Amino acid sequence: MMLTLAGAALLLLGASGPSPSTHVALSAEFVPPARAGASAHVAVTLSPRDADVRVNEEPAPRLKLEADEPVLVDKQAPATRSSSFDPQNARYLDPALPVHFPVAVKPTAPRGKQTVKARVTYFYCSKREGWCRKGTDDVEFAVDVR
């Protein structure tokens, strides 16, 4: 019994942040501005692992950079309040298209290739099984600061 409690304590202490979703796989990449004056963004692809699972358009997915992020600054508009969720009229994201989150490179960002960490929050549903859940996953991507 003591070994089981010690093992459980180690598992709890070792857990830092959310565990990845078993229903949706995420990947992220930094997309620099296409031309001078244009905006940079982080493109996040949310790929359901089960054909029945869909990622909701509303409430819209959100990207949150780490508080002490030295490379990027978030340029997203503030989150808006959504009306109550209606599963019968829900709209879903196309899994083939990434969601774009506007960002800018900080003028004080260190030069060279930098790894940026962020957290993505989204909502997804299974129509067949009749449930909806909130997903929160960590992503990492490279930014080449010139």
Residues of each region from the PLM?
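Bacterial N-terminal signal peptides
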Residues: 2-14
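Extracellular/lumen-exposed scaffold segments
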Residues: 16-146
